[in-house]
Amino acid sequence: MILEHVLVLSAYLFLLGLYGLIMSRNMVRALMCLELILNAVNMNLVTFSDFFDNSQLKGNIFCIFVIAIAAAEAAIGLAIVSSIYRNRKSTRINQSTLLNK
């Protein structure tokens, strides 16, 4: 695959996730946009690892670590969101004043 095509796709995914993260008012949607950003970073890691140093798998191994961290982040984030929803009956970011106290 051509390097430029993958980089353009990765940049598009990153910008789409960044736009969604900035504009979203729902916590679950913000978590999904954060996952899009992390997947764009993973695409870059694997692409550059394959393109510049094909004999070593450092980018692929680091990508696996990022996926594991993203899974833990998603699990903790969804647990926090479900706890906030149980207490506040809303998952909107601008209505949550839990951290202001």
Curated annotation (Swiss-Prot):
Reaction catalysis annotation: a plastoquinone + NADH + (n+1) H(+)(in) = a plastoquinol + NAD(+) + n H(+)(out); a plastoquinone + NADPH + (n+1) H(+)(in) = a plastoquinol + NADP(+) + n H(+)(out)
Entry superkingdom: Eukaryota
Gene3D superfamilies: 1.10.287.3510
GO cellular component: a single term: chloroplast thylakoid membrane
A Gene Ontology BP annotation from the UniProt entry: ATP synthesis coupled electron transport
GO molecular function: oxidoreductase activity, acting on NAD(P)H, quinone or similar compound as acceptor; quinone binding
The enzyme's E.C. designation: 7.1.1.-
Keywords: Chloroplast, Membrane, NAD, NADP, Plastid, Plastoquinone, Quinone, Thylakoid, Translocase, Transmembrane, Transmembrane helix, Transport
Subcellular localization: Plastid, Chloroplast thylakoid membrane
InterPro entries assigned to the protein according to its UniProt record, in alphabetical order: NADH_UbQ_OxRdtase_chain4L/K, NUOK/Mnh_C1-like
Membrane topology designation: Multi-pass membrane protein
Residues spanning the membrane: 2-22, 32-52, 61-81
Main location: plastid
HAMAP family linked: NDH1_NuoK
Protein family membership: Belongs to the complex I subunit 4L family.
Subunit structure: NDH is composed of at least 16 different subunits, 5 of which are encoded in the nucleus.
Free-text function comment from the UniProt entry: NDH shuttles electrons from NAD(P)H:plastoquinone, via FMN and iron-sulfur (Fe-S) centers, to quinones in the photosynthetic chain and possibly in a chloroplast respiratory chain. The immediate electron acceptor for the enzyme in this species is believed to be plastoquinone. Couples the redox reaction to proton translocation, and thus conserves the redox energy in a proton gradient.
Name of protein: NAD(P)H-quinone oxidoreductase subunit 4L, chloroplastic
Origin species: Lobularia maritima
Gene: ndhE
